[in-house]
């Protein structure tokens, strides 16, 4: 039997349907020679300080730097401290049993740094030695999953990706735990959270806040003129220059007023070409969604993730705005598909030649730029 592990139940359900694992068991699907199970996010995490015998916020305990980090099931906070999440513990038992009884494991967690860490932490925590291979796909369409299953890659290919995620996880722990305890002890009033990302971000917000508070507006004078143009139109002009003193502005104003009319002495017309924008990565999608619709970054990611899980777009957490040649070859089909949708049919030119500006194999990272998949929305 082969075990496939996905990052969440909804993805496991899609993969199970494709491989014929139609029998539902507690914590997994089975059938067709496969067991398809799932995590729900990070089932395993780094232990909190009390897992190393360090309790409370005590100055003499700092810095807390474990010789070896300990992995534990995901914890929930209670009045008496942290304890393992019972649902997580149950799912880990299911996964361990499946891992230990399989000939090999197919890793189908999200194809990215955190998805790799979710599996590797589980793998190490359960003490598993079963060989594993990687399913690496950029969308959840049936076609993409089937192609991915035909082209499974050796798990060791992603060792460096795991090590990068592990370094991120451990650095977050070291900065967060030690920074929070040190600041809270020094301040002496409650708990002050410190984080590797959140604290520099908060500092930037505070810096902008104080820049705004310290800003002193200065009054200026500017010349605005409205004059009759051709065909009874009103033509308005504004001076590019601004004056701090009213007298300087009034001097020019009086000269214009005395002239009584304006004459166009020079007119230029220039033709400019503008490059089409690159395709979206997650960051540019979030920026545009915020500008046009007021979405927060989290709202955009959540919406994109749902569209991905419904097979409508490719992997949303991409950091690339480029696509490889083989994906570019599919773009005419995608444009034709979009043109069949009622709300878009007037916006897509028939047989349009797509631009190649976003085509560059060398600039594609783990995943290519965001694209629609060609699946029709329900």
Predicted regions and their residues:
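Generic beta-strand/beta-sheet core signal
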Residues: 7, 39, 108-110, 226-228, ...
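Conserved, well-folded catalytic cores of nucleic-acid-processing
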Residues: 18-22, 98, 105, 125-129, ...
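Short, solvent-exposed helix-loop connector elements
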Residues: 183-191, 376-378
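Extended, highly charged linker/hinge segments and catalytic-adjacent loops that couple domains
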Residues: 158, 162-163, 174-176, 303, ...
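Intrinsically disordered, low-complexity regulatory segments
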Residues: 1-169, 173-175, 179, 353-354
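Generic recognition of stable, solvent-exposed alpha-helical segments in well-folded globular domains
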Residues: 6-10, 14, 90-93, 113, ...
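Long, highly charged, low-complexity internal segments
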Residues: 35, 43-84, 192-305, 309, ...
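Conserved short loop/turn motifs at secondary-structure junctions
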Residues: 1-3, 109-111, 188-191, 269-277, ...
């Amino acid at each position: 039997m082969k075990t496939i592990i996905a990052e969440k139940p909804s993805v496991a359900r899609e993969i199970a349907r494709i491989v014929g694992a139609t029998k539902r068991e507690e914590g997994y699907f089975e059938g067709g020679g496969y067991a398809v199970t799932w995590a729900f996010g990070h089932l395993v995490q780094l232990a909190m300080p009390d897992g190393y015998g360090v309790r409370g916020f005590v100055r003499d305990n700092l810095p807390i730097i474990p010789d070896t980090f300990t992995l534990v099931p995901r914890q929930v906070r209670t009045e008496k401290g942290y304890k393992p999440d019972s649902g997580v513990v149950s799912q880990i038992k299911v996964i361990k049993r499946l891992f230990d009884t399989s000939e090999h494991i197919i890793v189908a967690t999200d194809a990215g740094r955190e998805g790799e860490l979710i599996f590797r932490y589980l793998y190490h925590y359960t003490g598993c030695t079963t060989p594993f291979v990687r399913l690496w796909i950029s969308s959840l369409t049936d076609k993409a999953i089937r192609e991915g299953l035909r082209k499974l890659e050796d798990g060791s290919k992603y060792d460096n990706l795991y090590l990068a995620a592990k370094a991120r996880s451990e650095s977050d722990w070291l900065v967060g735990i030690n920074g929070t305890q040190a600041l809270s002890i020094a301040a002496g009033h409650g708990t002050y959270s410190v984080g590797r990302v959140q604290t520099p971000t908060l500092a930037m917000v505070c810096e902008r806040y104080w820049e705004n508070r310290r800003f002193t507006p200065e009054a200026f004078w500017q010349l605005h003129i409205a004059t009759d143009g051709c065909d009874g139109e009103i033509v308005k002009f504004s001076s590019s220059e601004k004056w701090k003193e009213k007298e300087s502005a009034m001097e020019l104003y009086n000269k214009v007023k005395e002239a009584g009319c304006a004459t166009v002495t020079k007119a230029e017309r220039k033709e400019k070409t503008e490059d089409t924008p690159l395709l979206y990565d997650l960051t540019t999608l979030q920026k545009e969604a915020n500008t046009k619709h007021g979405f927060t970054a989290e709202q955009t990611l959540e919406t994109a993730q749902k569209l991905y899980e419904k097979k409508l777009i490719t992997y949303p957490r991409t950091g690339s705005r480029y696509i490889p040649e083989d994906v570019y070859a599919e773009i005419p089909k995608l444009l034709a598909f979009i043109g069949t949708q009622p709300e878009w049919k007037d916006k897509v030119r028939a047989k349009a030649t797509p631009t190649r500006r976003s085509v560059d194999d060398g600039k594609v990272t783990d995943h290519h730029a965001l694209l629609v998949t060609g699946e029709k929305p329900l």
